[in-house]
Structures are given as C-alpha cells and as structure tokens.
C-alpha cells in the first residue's frame, strides 16, 4: 500500500504541516486507492477533479503562511444522502439518480471551513432503508473484509471506504443503526451522536425524529475531531440543541478507565444472539473490568418492544417525508402521463425500489384512519417508556454496553427475500435512536471465520466524549 495512505489523521496532519507530503499527493493516492478497490462499489461518484483542485489550493494556502484548518487535507467520503453543492444527491435511488444538489448541508459547510477534502459520495441503501447496502439503485457494496459478505447498512459505502483505506474518515447517517451496524461489520468505529447534536439541514430525511449524521473512522481520536467540527446549534435546523460543544479530543486524551461504571443489560444477551458474538463481547467486557471499569447488571425491560416500535414510527415518518418525490418538481418522471394522478403513481412506482415501497406502504397503513391509535399513537407511548428505561439505568451507570449486531456479516443476497430477518439485524441499535441518545460501535474481535464483531456503548444524552473515550480504551486492550 502507498506510504501516502494513513491510519489516523494525526499522522497525516504532522506530515502535511511539516511539508513532508503535500495535500495534492495524498489526495491523489486516495483517489488511486478508490480506483484499485472499485469492485467493492463503495462509491456512487468520485470527485477526482474537484478533490485534486481543492488539495492543490490547500497546498497553496499553507505555502502562503495561512493557518490550516482543524481538518486540513483530511480525505473524506460522504454518504450520498448528505447534500454537497453541485454534486449528485441520489440517496441510492433511481428517483434521484440525476438530481444535483443546489446547496451544501450544514455539516458539509463546517467540514469545508476546516479544510477537509471530499473524495466522493458513498453508496448506501436506497433512502437509507436497509441493513446491507444491497437496496441501492447503483448496485450492492461488498465488504472489504470478505467480498462475499454484506458490509451492513445503510451506510455501507461509507464503512467500506474507511475500512478499505479509500478514505480516512467518512460521514454517514444513522436512523436505526445505519452507522453502527456497518461499522461493526467492517471492523471500524461508527459513532451516532445524540439527536440534535449535529444539524440535519441538508440530510435527506428518512425518519426526521430519528436521523442523525454520524462519523465512521479507524480511530476514536479522528471521530472525536470530526464531531467537534460538525456538532452545534444551527438556525437552519430547529431540532439542534444549544448544548455547548465539548472539547471531545481533549476528553478522549485525558480519559481514565478506572472507576467507569458499565451497565450490562440481560436483555442484550438472549438466545437470539450468536454465541460467538456473545463470547467475543463478554471477553472484551472482562478486559475492560481488568482495566479498572466496573460491570453492573441493569435492566431495560421494554427493549423487547423496540424493534416493532421503531418500524412503526420510522416507516410512518418515511411515508410522510418521501411524499415529496412525485415526479412533478424534481427527480425521475415516468413517461406514463395520460393524467396527473397516473404520472404521480407511475413515477413513484418506477422510481422507488422494493424496500422503499414496502416501508412507505407500512407507514401509510399505520397512519391511516382506524389504525393510527392502534399502532402509531401506541408506539409513541412505548418510545417514551424505552427512553425512561435508559434514563433510569443511567442513574447508576455511566454507559451501557452490549453487542452491536446479533449476527456476523451475512452473505450477499442471503436475506433480501426475508425482510423480517433483515430487520432483526437492527435489534440492538434502534433503542438509541428511539431514545435520542449517543452510541458507538467499536471493533471487539472476530468469529472463527475471521468475520468482524462490534461492541456497542450507549451513552447519556450528550455523553459523546465518554463513549469516544471508551472506544479509544477498547482499542488499546
């Protein structure tokens, strides 16, 4: 591998600022790596000319004596549901396959202001609906650990880009586990911040009360640095919090494992959990205990209802959010146009994939007259109870730990005809989205077949610094 491919941004930054390497050379090396690994299908589009031009401009900025940004020269991949002005914003869907964004997302503006370099847009499950990155209109993404396996989803392209050294850091989005589950499957770190910590302006909506932009990286320090840049209140997103952005990088650097109280829910270790994954996760927890942490049993009694609750509420929000894609204003328009209603119906039927249509229909059903109270309203009540379970547990512990996924990476195509089996892959991740709290997946080891296993740490609201610090501690064990 090229000596211009790095494992951490701190290594790259030292070389860039000492002028031992140039932004242009590093960017070119990553673009070459993307070409070498194109069979993995991690990218929908590669910004070769734009990236090289930006890198060249950054080199000139440094040569002129101007202060470099916090992310100077950081090569990044961006999930293709996050708006970048002038670039295609497809959401992995036929209906938006030719749509170009006319503005930058707030997170993108913040990254650009700190001198990051965007290498390309990462592949994803269509409209972020999936757990395998197989529902993309642009084809499935393959896991770089084992190309016969899925990389997880929906941010599978972002995860593979980082895991295969085609980007140093990537942005993804997490509605029910879409950053953490692919991070687990690809043996990297995946952070979902607290709801409202990062602006959703410019993130194409799936479930507006669940969605959060997250970070995928190989080190906790890199995730902390990028979060520090993109977090914060935004006038363009009324759901962002005015909670001050903490110095996450400093928190990670000064963290001590001794005395940390880790809650272990019995509900996360059931017969549904793969036995090899259970053994790997428990071994990592014992290693944390040996390092000074305290393991404390906790209970999350309503977690058994989490998956059903999530798929009622998230699909209801998707039904509403995706109503805007009708062929009239932008996106794909069917040639069947005998009247307006036929144009609407045909454009959506032809433009959306099977999984998206399935979730729109389910969401429309639970919102319909006669079923709203039985399903949607009841699910909202259960959502509140699930959050209360977490807040009660956090009265006695600092974080909650368990497996990220109940199963290891599965074979491409294995679950495409069984949506319920696919949905079960989210069983441990959806509770953090339902509760609006931060969570992170960290590599914990591997199965006998050398497939990655992730361990998940769920934190208190706005406790990103703590879970990022634990991620660093786990990496050193």
Swiss-Prot record:
Cited function: Allows the formation of correctly charged Gln-tRNA(Gln) through the transamidation of misacylated Glu-tRNA(Gln) in organisms which lack glutaminyl-tRNA synthetase. The reaction takes place in the presence of glutamine and ATP through an activated gamma-phospho-Glu-tRNA(Gln).
Example GO biological process: translation
Entry keyword set: ATP-binding, Ligase, Nucleotide-binding, Protein biosynthesis
GO cellular component terms, A-Z: glutamyl-tRNA(Gln) amidotransferase complex
Keyword check for Ligase: yes
Protein name listed in UniProt: Glutamyl-tRNA(Gln) amidotransferase subunit A
Gene3D superfamilies: Amidase signature (AS) domain
Family that this chain belongs to: Belongs to the amidase family. GatA subfamily.
Subunit architecture: Heterotrimer of A, B and C subunits.
Keyword Protein biosynthesis: yes
Active site: 79, 154, 178
Catalysed reaction, written as an equation: L-glutamyl-tRNA(Gln) + L-glutamine + ATP + H2O = L-glutaminyl-tRNA(Gln) + L-glutamate + ADP + phosphate + H(+)
PANTHER family listed in its UniProt record: GLUTAMYL-TRNA(GLN) AMIDOTRANSFERASE SUBUNIT A, TRANSAMIDASE
Top-rank EC class of the record's enzyme: ligase
Single GO molecular function: ATP binding
EC number: 6.3.5.7
């Amino acid at each position: 591998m090229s000596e211009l491919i790095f494992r951490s941004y701190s290594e790259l930054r030292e070389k860039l600022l000492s002028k031992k390497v140039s932004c242009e050379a590093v960017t070119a090396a990553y673009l070459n790596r993307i070409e070498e690994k194109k069979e993995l299908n991690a990218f929908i589009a590669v910004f070769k000319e734009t990236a090289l031009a930006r890198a060249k401009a950054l080199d000139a900025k440094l040569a002129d004596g101007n202060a470099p940004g916090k992310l100077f020269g950081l090569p990044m991949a961006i999930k293709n549901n996050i708006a970048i002005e002038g670039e295609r914003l497809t959401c992995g869907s036929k209906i938006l396959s030719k749509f170009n964004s006319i503005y930058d997302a707030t997170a993108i503006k913040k990254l650009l202001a700190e001198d990051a370099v965007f290498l390309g847009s990462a592949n994803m499950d269509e409209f972020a609906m999936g757990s395998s990155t197989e529902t993309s209109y642009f084809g499935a993404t393959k896991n770089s650990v084992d190309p016969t396996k899925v990389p997880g989803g929906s941010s599978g392209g972002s995860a593979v880009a980082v895991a295969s050294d085609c980007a140093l850091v990537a942005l993804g989005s997490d509605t029910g586990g879409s950053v953490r589950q692919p991070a687990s499957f690809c043996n990297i770190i995946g952070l979902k911040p607290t709801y409202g910590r990062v602006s959703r302006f410019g993130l194409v909506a799936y479930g507006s009360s669940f969605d959060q932009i997250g970070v995928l990286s190989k080190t906790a320090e890199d995730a902390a640095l990028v979060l520090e840049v993109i977090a914060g209140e935004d006038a363009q997103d009324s759901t962002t919090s005015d909670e001050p952005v903490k110095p996450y990088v400093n928190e990670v650097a000064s963290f001590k494992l001794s005395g940390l109280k880790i809650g272990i829910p019995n509900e996360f270790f059931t017969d549904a959990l793969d036995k090899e994954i259970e053994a790997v996760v428990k071994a990592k927890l014992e290693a944390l205990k040996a390092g000074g942490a305290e393991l404390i049993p906790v209970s999350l009694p309503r977690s058994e209802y989490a998956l059903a609750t999530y798929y009622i509420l998230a699909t209801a929000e998707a039904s509403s959010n995706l109503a805007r894609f009708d062929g009239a204003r932008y996106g794909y328009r069917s040639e069947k146009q005998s009247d307006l209603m036929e144009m609407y119906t045909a454009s959506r039927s032809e433009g959306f994939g099977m999984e998206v249509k399935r979730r729109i229909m389910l969401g429309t059903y639970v919102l319909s007259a006669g079923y709203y109270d039985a399903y949607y309203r009841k699910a909202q009540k259960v959502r509140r109870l699930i959050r209360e379970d977490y807040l009660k547990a956090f009265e006695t512990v600092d974080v909650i730990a368990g497996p990220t996924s109940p199963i290891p990476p599965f074979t491409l195509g294995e679950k495409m005809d069984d949506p319920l089996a696919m949905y079960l892959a989210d069983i441990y991740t959806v509770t953090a989205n339902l509760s609006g709290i931060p969570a992170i997946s960290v590599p914990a080891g591997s199965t006998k077949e050398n497939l990655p296993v992730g361990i998940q740490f769920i934190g208190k609201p706005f406790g990103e610094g703590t879970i990022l610090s634990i991620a660093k501690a786990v990496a050193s064990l």
